[in-house]
């Protein structure tokens, strides 16, 4: 019973609504720039077959166009974006410690952070000279927090290659 009522409401004044939509003004093409018009006339005079190619409809492309679905959303107003940018507090930066590595294009590093090369070098320094490169000295040198340096030294290690000497055992001969 509900479908009958809804169908009646949906089909009410259907012809007038359809006629109104059909008789609406269609959007016109945006005007071309004067320099573009002269270039188009020049190209069409050089290649007259292009004009027919432009007017011809390609059924394959039209069928592909029917499958396209566009979902658009309004962009975020610029006022909200500017407000979000101003909320961030300015960060303090420091220069990288290793200037001999030219592969890295890092100009400045935020305080409290280190680059990968700095992390590898401080891990290697701590491994080679643990008495001089203590966690306190590393934290002071690279402007890091003490707990972060302790965690770094505890859980990370540099890559190490160990070569084991060959053993003098006789191989079992296959039969």
From Swiss-Prot:
Residues carrying lipid (N-myristoyl glycine): 2
**GO BP of this protein:** mitochondrial respiratory chain complex I assembly
Question: How does the UniProt record describe the way this protein sits in the membrane?
Answer: Lipid-anchor
In the UniProt record, does the keyword Membrane occur? yes
Q: Which organism is it from?
A: Pongo abelii
Modification note: Phosphorylated on serine. Prolactin stimulate serine phosphorylation.
List the lineage, top down.
Eukaryota, Metazoa, Chordata, Craniata, Vertebrata
Function as written in the Swiss-Prot or TrEMBL entry: May be involved in cell proliferation and survival of hormone-dependent tumor cells. Involved in the assembly of mitochondrial NADH:ubiquinone oxidoreductase complex (complex I).
Q: How does it assemble?
A: Binds calmodulin. Interacts with NDUFAF3.
The protein's UniProt keywords, in alphabetical order, are: Calmodulin-binding, Lipoprotein, Membrane, Mitochondrion, Myristate, Phosphoprotein
Any keyword Nucleus?
A: no
What is one cellular component GO term in this UniProt entry?
mitochondrion
Q: Name one GO molecular function term.
A: calmodulin binding
Q: What is this protein called?
A: NADH dehydrogenase [ubiquinone] 1 alpha subcomplex assembly factor 4
Instruction: Please give the superkingdom of this protein's source.
Output: Eukaryota
**Could you say which protein family the record assigns here?**
Belongs to the NDUFAF4 family.
The protein's predominant localisation is mitochondrion
Q: Where in the cell is it found?
A: Mitochondrion; Membrane
Q: At what positions is Phosphoserine found?
A: 35
